Amino acid sequence: MIKRIDHVAVAVRNLDEAIKSFETLFDLKPSKIEEIPDQGVKAALIPIGDTEIEFIQPIRPDTGVAKFLESKGEGIHHIAIEVDDTDAELKRLEEKGAKLIDKQGRSGLAGKIGFVHPKSVHGVLLELAQKV
């Protein structure tokens, strides 16, 4: 079941600068900063009300985020929706004909995550996130 928007992810070239900007301009501080080697990113979550902004910086040039920055520059990368069960939701969406990037959930900064291909959601990269 879909619960709420969990976070909006913004691809950045320099995570420290992005964090500093939000601290200076909005007095917002990250609740979590983590390197996620299997995804090739370093990320920070900044709480805003009951949702978060996630800054993601590539740590390798061969990642999807690095390619995104190369082609589109900094900006919104994906929207994450909180779900009760990532695997069940991915299966349900696939049965309805959605094209998936992940067939099963995997570990991510927002919990157990899985991505739906933008071709299935009108150009939006959609992340499903289950709190664990």
Give the predicted meaning of each segment:
Residues 16-29, 93-96:
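Amphipathic alpha-helical segments
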Residues 69-95:
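Short, solvent-exposed interaction modules
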Residues 1-17, 74-83, 132:
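N-terminal beta-strand motif that seeds the catalytic metal site of vicinal oxygen chelate
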Residues 17, 35-39:
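Short glycine/proline-centered loop/turn elements that form peptide/ligand docking sites
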Residues 44-47, 54, 81, 90-132:
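Vicinal oxygen chelate
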